[in-house]
């Protein structure tokens, strides 16, 4: 079988505003829509400042991983060391970071990690930096990854997603 390569979604992602654009149309991200539908009160009891600090921490961990994968720069953080160990232990072969997928109509999102498991098969992973992985957060991540898998398989003809990982 011929090796399947990931394709560009055509979606422009504005990282600063966290917006997805396909031409003139703004698309919605999956995670927040799922969170609002499944767990609308998930963060209501948490002070805004705490949420901002958690978001900043999550962004820094994601950036640390992305810089390592693109430039082989190891910043020495425990989070990056843990990520490297998890990848080694599970024989994960990096294919892409922050890979944008879309249905081409209404939805788009960035997959944190895409790993190759075969010529036409991929593993997708979401890196979570929650202080505690609750059953609700795990369920939300599973739905999120399932949507990502569906979009990737629609976007990349012939590709299959054979595993979904939550890295926490």
Residues covered by each model-derived region:
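Metal-dependent nuclease catalytic cores that hydrolyze phosphodiester bonds in DNA/RNA
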Residues: 1-108
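Mg2+/Mn2+-dependent nuclease catalytic core
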Residues: 95-168
């Amino acid at each position: 079988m011929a090796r399947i390569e990931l394709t560009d979604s055509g979606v422009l992602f504005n990282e600063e505003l966290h917006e997805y654009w396909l031409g003139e149309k703004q698309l919605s991200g999956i995670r927040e829509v799922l969170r609002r539908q499944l767990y609308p009160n998930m963060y209501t009891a948490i002070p805004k400042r705490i949420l901002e600090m958690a978001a900043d921490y999550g962004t820094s961990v994601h950036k640390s991983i992305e810089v390592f994968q693109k430039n082989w720069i190891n910043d020495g953080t425990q989070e990056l060391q843990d990520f490297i160990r998890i990848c080694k232990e599970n024989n994960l072969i990096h294919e892409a970071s922050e890979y944008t997928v879309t249905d081409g109509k209404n939805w788009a999102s960035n997959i944190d990690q895409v790993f190759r498991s075969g010529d036409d098969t991929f593993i997708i992973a979401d890196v979570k930096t929650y202080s505690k992985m609750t059953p609700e957060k795990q369920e939300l991540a599973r739905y999120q990854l399932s949507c990502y898998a569906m979009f990737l398989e629609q976007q990349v003809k012939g590709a299959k997603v054979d595993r979904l990982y939550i890295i926490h």
